[in-house]
């Protein structure tokens, strides 16, 4: 993942040594992308912290249903104590399902927003930037799906965490490069 990211950043830097000439629409999409990816990273951390990663072991359904029983109030109780949730926690299955489903929904929102940004970048002739972002998004989607299909193997789970880092870093470079 690190080598892929280095190549993408180098390609971006080689493409333009001067500031990118993004129109206002692209700048707004970059800002929106930063917000939705940040929220999704938080949701991923919440999913992991509350042992909800394997609450839905099938795709595209969860427990064989489109909307299985889910307890969003318990799942998103941010005032819960830390100690009792160690090593499996005390949350109900329905609370964990709610957390997992929210992370899945977040992934759909992130994908739609990033695809809008990628399409706008292509229209703006920023082909390498769009291609790099497309590849990073595809990698992250693949790792997320693999986590569900293969029941959360450590290497894929860590790769998924790094993929989130790559996405947010890529977007930050786009946003803050002058």
Annotated model-derived regions:
Residues 1-5:
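Short, small-residue-biased leader/transition segments that mark boundaries at the very start
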Residues 27-47:
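Alpha-helical transmembrane segments of multi-pass integral membrane proteins
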Residues 118-133:
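Membrane-interface helix-loop-helix junctions at transmembrane boundaries of multi-pass membrane enzymes
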Residues 8, 169-178:
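A juxtamembrane structural motif centered on a specific transmembrane helix
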Residues 37-42, 136-146:
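Aromatic-anchored segments of alpha-helical transmembrane domains
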Residues 42, 48-104, 108-109, 115:
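Membrane-interfacial catalytic/cofactor-binding modules of polytopic membrane enzymes
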């Amino acid at each position: 993942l690190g080598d892929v990211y280095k190549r993408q950043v180098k390609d971006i830097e080689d493409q333009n040594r001067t500031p990118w000439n993004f129109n206002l629409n692209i700048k707004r999409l970059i800002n929106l992308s930063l917000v939705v990816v940040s929220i999704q990273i938080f949701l991923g951390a919440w999913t992991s912290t509350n042992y909800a990663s394997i609450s839905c072991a099938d795709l595209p359904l969860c427990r064989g249903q489109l909307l299985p029983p889910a307890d969003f109030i318990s799942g998103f109780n941010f005032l819960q104590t830390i100690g009792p949730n160690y090593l499996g926690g005390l949350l109900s299955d329905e609370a964990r399902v709610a957390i997992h489903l929210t992370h899945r929904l977040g992934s759909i929102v992130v994908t739609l927003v990033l695809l809008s940004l990628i399409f706008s970048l292509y229209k703006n002739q920023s082909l390498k930037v769009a291609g790099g972002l497309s590849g990073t998004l595809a990698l992250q989607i693949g790792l997320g799906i693999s986590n569900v299909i293969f029941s959360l193997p450590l290497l894929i789970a860590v790769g998924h965490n790094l993929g989130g880092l790559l996405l947010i870093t890529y977007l930050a470079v786009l946003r803050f490069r002058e």
